[in-house]
């Protein structure tokens, strides 16, 4: 009988220890507060559960100086304002699972004794970077949103969250873009200038290669007429006309009797032969003798 009683006592002791361990592992599980929460009131409990109430956190401190566990899960929170946690000096565990957190205030990250239970998300990157400064920091974990299984936060951030573009990266990108634009515009400007110079040099070279016959001669204002009259008295000089006169053969009056078109071709030309009166640029009248019949050949 004594041995049976001893076994029963040991069994009861083991069950009691198991219950104590289970209660300790639940992190002071407490009752959920009603949906309407007055943030101005004072909360004296050590465990505050505001889970699933669809709350938004105010920018003023929560009056709960004795709280050790704070459950804010399933509220659709995106930001944890640092001012809300200013007076929670005894807070040890903060539960924010099932919230789409974009960022966590740096004041919470600097509290090295605070345990944060949150879903794995890229919003924890800044919090993780600051927590690396805590001495004796254990491995930081996050919970899978679906299975709530713990995962290594460092591994999750490296695999799932690419490094964000900080001010230095953005500045370098802007500077590189500006440099590229300046280089492209400079190249286009240099190409246009080189093209203009090449055209100018080609034009000068083509001018230099032109023969004297290709160069157009200037047209004088005065162009004399040809006539078949004998030289007469010199006409008075008159200013040159601005209009260009056409060349033409002008025959005035009847040809002289001794100026026969059928004269012998080999006879020497005399003073009475037909001639043309040519007036040069200097207005000098000069006779030009010719045999018109031979000229017609």
Swiss-Prot record:
Residues 26-169 are extracellular. InterPro entries: Leu-rich_rpt, LRR_dom_sf, LRRC25. It is found in: Membrane; Cytoplasm. LRR repeats lie at residues 66-89, 90-113. It is a single-pass type I membrane protein. SUPFAM superfamilies: L domain-like (SSF52058). The modification Phosphoserine is found at residues 211, 238, 267. Glycans are attached at residues 44, 49, 133, 152. Pfam families: LRR_8. Residues 1-25 form the signal peptide. Gene3D superfamilies: Ribonuclease Inhibitor (3.80.10.10). GO terms for biological process: canonical NF-kappaB signal transduction; connective tissue replacement involved in inflammatory response wound healing; gene expression; heart development; inflammatory response; response to angiotensin; response to hydrostatic pressure; response to transforming growth factor beta. Its main location: membrane. The keyword Plastid does not apply. GO terms for cellular component: cytoplasm; membrane. Residues 202-244 are annotated as: Disordered. Residues 191-297 are cytoplasmic. The modification Phosphotyrosine is found at residue 289. The chain crosses the membrane at residues 170-190. Keywords: Cytoplasm, Glycoprotein, Leucine-rich repeat, Membrane, Phosphoprotein, Repeat, Signal, Transmembrane, Transmembrane helix. Plays a role in the inhibition of RLR-mediated type I interferon signaling pathway by targeting RIGI for autophagic degradation. Interacts specifically with ISG15-associated RIGI to promote interaction between RIGI and the autophagic cargo receptor p62/SQSTM1 to mediate RIGI degradation via selective autophagy. Plays also a role in the inhibition of NF-kappa-B signaling pathway and inflammatory response by promoting the degradation of p65/RELA. Interacts with RIGI. Interacts with SQSTM1. Interacts with p65/RELA; this interaction promotes the degradation of RELA through autophagy. This is Leucine-rich repeat-containing protein 25. The gene is Lrrc25.
């Amino acid at each position: 009988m004594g041995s049976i009683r001893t076994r029963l006592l040991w069994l009861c002791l083991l069950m009691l220890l198991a219950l104590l361990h289970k209660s300790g592992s639940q992190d002071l599980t407490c009752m959920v507060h009603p949906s309407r929460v007055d943030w101005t009131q004072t909360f004296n409990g050590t465990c505050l559960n505001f889970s699933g109430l669809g709350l938004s956190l105010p920018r003023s401190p929560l009056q709960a100086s004795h709280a050790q566990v704070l459950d804010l899960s399933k509220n659709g929170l995106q930001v944890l304002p640092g001012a809300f946690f200013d007076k929670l000096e005894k807070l040890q565990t903060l539960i924010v699972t099932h919230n789409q957190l974009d960022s966590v205030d740096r004041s919470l990250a600097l509290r090295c004794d605070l345990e944060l239970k949150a879903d794995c998300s890229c919003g924890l990157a800044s919090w993780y970077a600051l927590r690396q400064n805590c001495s004796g920091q254990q491995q930081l974990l996050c919970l899978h949103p679906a299975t709530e299984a713990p995962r290594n936060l460092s591994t999750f951030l490296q695999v799932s969250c690419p490094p964000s573009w900080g001010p230095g990266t953005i500045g370098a990108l802007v500077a590189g873009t500006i440099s590229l634009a300046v280089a492209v515009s400079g190249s286009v400007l240099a190409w246009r200038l080189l093209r203009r110079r090449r055209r100018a040099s080609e034009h000068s070279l083509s001018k230099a290669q032109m023969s004297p016959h290709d160069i157009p001669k200037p047209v004088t204002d005065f162009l004399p007429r040809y006539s078949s009259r004998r030289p007469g008295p010199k006409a008075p000089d008159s200013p040159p006309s601005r209009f260009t006169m056409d060349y033409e053969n002008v025959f005035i009056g009847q040809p002289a009797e001794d100026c026969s078109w059928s004269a012998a071709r080999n006879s020497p030309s005399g003073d009475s032969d037909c001639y043309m009166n040519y007036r040069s640029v200097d207005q000098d009248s000069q006779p030009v003798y010719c045999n018109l019949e031979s000229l017609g050949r």
